[in-house]
């Protein structure tokens, strides 16, 4: 596994954000603790990296109780970069729209966001090629208290967890 600093933007884009098969890269964290969704929501609202639609502001008090298959879009400079799927209180489900990750700066902001989020939930967060596949491949791991890691070898989600 290589740390993120080893690759230049061209290599990162080619490895993580290629769009010849799909425009979406899936994000998942398993085994969320009780109250984690509220913590994640508050983290999103407090970060200066992303903004959310006004209709989702003030949701913190009821987010754990009202899992309703809602989708919250996170915007970076008015571009819909990340979608958060409120399907479960037990795992984090998000995706990144790879079409809008067009610079190293945006990639680094995404890494900062997910590194901070992994510290908050005290669990690994995985960036996957396609969660729908039978054996999705892990492209990147965000670990609490460490730098993100790009996975250059083949690593399935089952192997990583």
Where are these regions (language model features)?
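Long, contiguous binding/interaction regions
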Residues: 2-8, 16, 90-104, 123, ...
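A structural detector for beta-sheet-dominated domains
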Residues: 7, 31-33, 85-87, 95-99, ...
């Amino acid at each position: 596994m290589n740390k993120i600093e080893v690759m230049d933007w061209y290599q990162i884009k080619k490895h993580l954000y290629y769009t010849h098969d799909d425009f979406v890269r899936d994000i998942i964290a398993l085994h969320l603790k009780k109250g984690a969704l509220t913590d994640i929501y508050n983290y999103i609202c407090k970060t200066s990296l992303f903004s959310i639609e006004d209709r989702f502001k003030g949701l913190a008090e009821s987010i754990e109780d009202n899992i309703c298959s809602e989708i919250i879009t996170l915007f970076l400079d008015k571009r819909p970069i990340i979608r958060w799927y409120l399907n479960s209180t037990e795992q984090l489900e998000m995706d990144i729209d790879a079409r809008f990750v067009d610079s190293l700066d945006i990639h680094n902001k995404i890494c900062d966001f997910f590194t901070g989020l992994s510290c908050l939930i005290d669990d690994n967060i995985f960036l996957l090629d396609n969660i729908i596949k039978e054996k999705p491949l892990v492209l990147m791991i965000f670990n609490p208290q460490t730098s993100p890691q790009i996975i250059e070898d083949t690593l399935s989600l089952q192997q990583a967890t």
